[in-house]
């Protein structure tokens, strides 16, 4: 009798549990509650593992990592978790700037903080710095420990150029020195001799440190590809490589002389260059907008300024230098030639893209009218204008850089285990790339910055610079 009563009790408890579960389900409650620090609810997730959107999702963050993603029917945040209501917005990975410049240590603390925040304000959560300085190691540690607000940093070395490296022995010495210092890659610049470049490449392979950046004119594109340069930035030396061997000038023409080559380039060589790039596995970081604004421009500073209101977040003396650089360049070059060079660069980029080359997004900020973070949106818009799909552009701004760094398990997607480096935007970027700029907020390593907080900080910066 007692056993029967216990059995009846267990059955009744089971029925009550089922009834409660049925009521919770009928009322729309989630099946599982997840503990964490912060949870996004009512968001549409762009995972960036492929071109699809996960609608009405809950994303839970703990200790700076994504720990759970699921539909609102399946999971929800436990009581006490801070909730960010996405209000049907779109949650995507943070952007990666693959050719950025970090604040000069000679700048004031305010200017340093401002430059770093400009990246974050625009959803740029990782930056590959391409002009090294010893002060950047401290900056990186301050960011890692939350003492300074800024993106995750990968540090390029002090410039390997002709002034610092004149012979092969110096190249070998610098490579070993920068590896020990802790730089993530070697920044290659102009002026290296063929011998010094080969010594750099051989020593870099020996000590296991990648190198990238410019292609020294004396070396040339094909040699750089052959010896394993990891990235070629600015499409450096691609136009020169389109000149047939029989017409190669006796000495390098340099950046300012590229226009002279337009009469002798042979675009039929482009497919061979694309194939060589793909076979080498080299990454290309084109920095298109800067080059068309500063070097192969057909517009003066007044017109550029009218399209770049974000210059109000830069020191006025910096903007004045930019104005002078653009106008001086326009006065000393032929606009038609600039237009032809820019068009050929666009053709090279699209040939590389369509041929399957590795491409990553970079802007060379802060340089001439390329304001950190904001310049990323201009660069992405241009790529779509040239014929890439929004998804393809987002790939090269998020997941593909993580592949470059061999860090696909760490960042570049919205997935469990990834860093909580996220950008919340109000419209679907797959439909219009300009929606990436319509931020509702940014999460940086698990720390949330609402659009209001970002806008207030930007307003303070503008006032600080007298705008």
Stretches with model-predicted labels:
Residues 31-36, 45, 50-92:
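Histidine-rich, glycine-flanked metal-binding segment
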Residues 89-147, 163-169, 195, 222-228, ...:
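Metal-associated gating/positioning segment near the N- to mid-region
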Residues 23-26:
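C-terminal motif of bacterial Sec signal peptides marking the signal peptidase cleavage site
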Residues 43, 59, 64, 88, ...:
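Divalent metal-coordination and catalytic microenvironments
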Residues 2-16:
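Bacterial N-terminal signal peptides that target proteins for export
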Residues 177-185, 192, 243-386, 461-465:
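Active-site neighborhoods of metal-dependent hydrolases
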Residues 115-134, 150-160, 179-192, 209-212, ...:
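Divalent metal-dependent hydrolysis catalytic cores, especially in the metallo-beta-lactamase
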Residues 45-58, 71-74, 371, 389-394, ...:
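Acidic, glycine-enriched loop/beta-strand segments at the rims
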């Amino acid at each position: 009798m007692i056993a029967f009563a216990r059995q009846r009790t267990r059955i009744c408890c089971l029925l009550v549990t089922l009834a409660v579960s049925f009521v919770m389900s009928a009322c729309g409650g989630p099946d599982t509650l997840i503990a964490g620090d912060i949870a996004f609810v009512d968001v549409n997730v762009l995972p960036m593992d492929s071109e699809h959107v996960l609608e009405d999702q809950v994303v839970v963050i703990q200790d700076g990592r994504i720990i759970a993603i699921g539909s609102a029917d399946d999971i929800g945040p436990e009581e006490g978790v801070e909730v960010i209501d996405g209000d049907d917005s779109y949650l995507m990975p943070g952007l990666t700037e693959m050719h950025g410049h970090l604040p000069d240590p000679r700048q004031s603390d305010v200017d340093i903080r401002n430059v770093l925040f400009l990246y974050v304000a625009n959803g740029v959560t990782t930056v590959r710095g391409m002009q090294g300085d010893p002060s950047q190691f401290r900056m990186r540690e301050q960011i890692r420990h939350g003492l300074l607000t800024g993106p995750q940093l990968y540090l390029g070395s002090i410039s390997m150029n002709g002034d610092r490296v004149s012979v092969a022995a110096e190249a070998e010495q610098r490579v070993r020195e920068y590896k020990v210092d802790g730089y993530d890659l070697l920044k290659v610049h102009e002026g290296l001799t063929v011998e010094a470049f080969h010594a750099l490449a051989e020593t870099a392979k020996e000590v296991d440190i990648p190198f990238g950046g410019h292609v020294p004119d004396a070396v040339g594109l094909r040699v750089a590809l052959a010896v394993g340069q990891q990235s070629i930035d600015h499409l450096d030396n691609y136009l020169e490589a389109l000149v047939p061997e029989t017409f190669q000038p006796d000495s390098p023409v340099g950046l300012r002389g590229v226009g002279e080559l337009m009469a002798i380039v042979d675009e039929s060589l482009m497919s061979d260059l694309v194939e060589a790039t793909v076979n080498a596995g080299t990454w290309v970081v084109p920095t298109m907008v800067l080059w068309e604004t500063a070097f192969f421009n057909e517009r003066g500073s007044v017109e550029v300024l009218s399209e770049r209101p974000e210059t109000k977040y830069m020191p006025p003396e910096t903007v004045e230098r930019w104005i002078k650089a653009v106008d001086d360049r326009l006065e000393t070059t032929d606009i038609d030639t600039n237009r032809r060079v820019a068009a050929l660069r666009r053709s090279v980029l699209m040939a590389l893209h369509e041929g399957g080359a590795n491409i990553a997004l970079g802007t060379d900020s802060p340089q001439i009218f390329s304001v950190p973070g904001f310049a990323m949106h201009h660069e992405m818009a241009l790529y779509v204008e040239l014929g890439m799909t929004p998804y393809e552009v987002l790939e090269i701004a998020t997941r593909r850089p993580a592949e470059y760094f061999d860090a696909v398990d760490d960042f570049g997607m919205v997935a469990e285990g990834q860093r909580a480096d996220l950008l919340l935007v109000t419209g679907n970027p797959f439909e219009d790339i300009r929606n990436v700029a319509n931020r509702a907020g940014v999460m940086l390593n698990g720390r949330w910055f609402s659009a209001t907080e970002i806008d207030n900080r930007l307003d303070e910066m503008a006032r600080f610079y007298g705008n």
